[in-house]
Amino acid sequence: MAILDHVINIDPFWDDEYLYLDYQEEAFNNPLDTERWLKMGYRCNFVGAMCDMRKLQPSWNYKFVNHFTDLGWKDVGTSYYRMATGTILPTHQDIYKKYVELFDLQGKEHTIRRAIVFLEDWQSGHYLELKGQPVTGWKKGFTPIWAYDAPHMAANIGARPRYTLQITGHV
């Protein structure tokens, strides 16, 4: 596994409740990226299924919110993500449009942080790339953290869904 800027390992305390959430597929929120990917030759599914804070979250979700609040993050939001087999999210930078509007962070985007908690051990075909560094072989609880503009990509060419928890906050 590559050496990343900032990684924490969260001791697993969660059960499989995340498997049964009301996941919904939503269009990728940056049509310019989607257009660029199509021009590059990508012809795959660019979205996974999300269950964000507008929907019922697992009973233990508050523990993640508290953990990141204790790290100094403000306005912590969570979104569970199920990436099905064949889903590819090519290299992109998150734009946080709704988050910036909701918490009045226009001009302060540099304070936004993102963490991805891997809810299960790595499976063959599951992939993350962060700032050009490939990441595989993770254990449940592995949590890379990055600044708002870090380029990253994800894919699932494996046989099982890839489950993660996306955490957003600002410092």
Predicted regions and their residues:
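Catalytic core of Fe(II)/2-oxoglutarate
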Residues: 121-171
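Structured loops at beta-to-helix junctions and adjacent beta-edge loops in soluble globular domains
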Residues: 42-43, 49, 83, 120, ...
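Non-heme Fe(II)/2-oxoglutarate
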Residues: 1-80, 88
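A general structural signal for short secondary-structure junctions and capping/turn motifs
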Residues: 68-72, 106-109, 136, 155-157
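Short, conserved beta-strand element in jelly-roll/cupin
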Residues: 82-84, 102-124
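Histidine-centered catalytic micro-motifs
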Residues: 88-97, 104-108
